Amino acid sequence: MKIGIPREIKNNENRVGLSPSGVHALVESGHTVLVETNAGSGSFFEDVDYKEAGAEIVAEQAKVWDVDMVIKVKEPLESEYPYFKEGLVLFTYLHLANEEKLTQALIDRKVISIAYETVQLPDRSLPLLSPMSEVAGRMSAQVGAEFLQKLNGGMGILLGGVPGVPKGKVTIIGGGQAGTNAAKIALGLGADVTILDVNPKRLQQLDDLFGGRVHTIMSNPLNIELYVKQSDLVIGAVLIPGAKAPRLVTEDMIKQMKNGSVIIDIAIDQGGIFETTDKITTHDDPTYIKHGVVHYAVANMPGAVPRTSTLALNNATLPYALMLANKGYREAFKSNQPLSLGLNTYKGHVTNKGVAEAFEMEYKSVEEALQL
C-alpha cells in the first residue's frame, strides 16, 4: 500500500501522523511511505530521520495525498478538501459531529474515513483517543493555573494556596480519561478538587483511585450549577463517542461565577459543554473573556506538547495502521470490530450514528456499507 504523511496545517499543530519508527514499521512490512517535507519538524523529527526510516520525502502537498491511505493527526482543513478522492482511506482524528462541511466533503468525494476517536474496544474504552485525552487532561490543569494568574486575565489565585490562605477550587465535569488526568495534576498543584460524573460506579472508582482526596459528586443540573459558581477553575471533560458534546453548563451558570475565574473546555472539538464557548480559539490567541470569566477553547491542546503527543499517539495508532495496510480496509474491518467502529464515512455514506444524527443524514451500519 502507498501511504502519505502530510504536514499538519492547523494553527500551531506541531504533531505528526507517524514518527520515524512508525514509518520504519510500515516500510518493513512492504509498504511505500511518502512524508511531506518538514512534516515532523514541529515534533523535532527531521526529514533525514524519516529518510533513514525508509520514507520518500516529497515537497508537493498534492503528491503526499495521492496515495491509498493518508495518516494524519487533526481533521483536514478546507484547503485540503480538493485532495479527497474516491476510495482514499483517511485515518485521523475527525470529530465530524461538529464538522458538517467536512462531513459533506467526505461523503461527496466517497472517502473512507476512520476517526481515531470512535475506535472502541469491547469494554467501551477508546484506545486511540485515550493518549490525547491523557495529555489534554493533564494540560488543562496546568493551563488553568496559568490563566488564573492576574497577568493572564485571571483573579490572581494560586491553586495550591499557602498556609493561612484557602486552596483554589477546581471542578471537573466528566470523570473519564481526560477528567481523571486533570484531577491528577490539579491535586499535584495542591488544589481542592471536585469531579462530577453521571455514573455512580465511575465515581466509586475515582474515590478509590484518589483515596478520598477528591470530592466525587453525581452530575446533574443542580449540582453542576452549585459547584460551577463556587469554582475558580472549571474543566469540561465530557465525551459521547462520535456525537456532539452536551451543553451542560448554561450561560446563567457562567454569569454566577466570580470575575477572573477560568473555564477550560476540553470537549470544544466536539462542540463544547459550555454555552458560552461559542467559538474555537487557537494557541496563538487561546482565551477570551465573557461575563468576566476567562474562556479557554483551544481544540488541539496536545499540539502544544508535540513530542510527547506524537510518540504517545504513534504507540496507539500504529497497530491499526499496520492492520489496514497489511490486510486492506475491507478485511481489517471484518476482522477487527473495534476498528470497524472507527469508520465514519464509507464511499458516500455516513456509518457513524452520532454523526448522522447531528446533521440529520442517512445512516448505514458498517455491515450494510461494506456490502455496497
From Swiss-Prot:
Superkingdom of this protein's organism: Bacteria
Keyword NAD (UniProt): yes
Pathway the protein takes part in: Amino-acid degradation; L-alanine degradation via dehydrogenase pathway; NH(3) and pyruvate from L-alanine: step 1/1
Residues at which NAD(+) binds: 169-199
Keyword NAD included in the entry's annotation: yes
Gene3D superfamilies linked: NAD(P)-binding Rossmann-like Domain (3.40.50.720)
Record-linked SUPFAM superfamilies: Formate/glycerate dehydrogenase catalytic domain-like, NAD(P)-binding Rossmann-fold domains
Family matches, as InterPro entries: Ala_DH, Ala_DH/PNT_CS2, AlaDH/PNT_CS1, AlaDH/PNT_N, AlaDH/PNT_NAD(H)-bd, NAD(P)-bd_dom_sf
Enzyme Commission numbers on file: 1.4.1.1
Single GO term (MF): alanine dehydrogenase activity
Residues annotated as the enzyme's active site: H95
Catalytic activity: L-alanine + NAD(+) + H2O = pyruvate + NH4(+) + NADH + H(+)
Record's keyword terms, sorted: NAD, Oxidoreductase
Function: May play a role in cell wall synthesis as L-alanine is an important constituent of the peptidoglycan layer.
Family designation: Belongs to the AlaDH/PNT family.
NCBIfam families to which the protein is assigned, alphabetical: alaDH
Identification of the protein by name: Alanine dehydrogenase 2
Organism: Staphylococcus aureus (strain NCTC 8325 / PS 47)
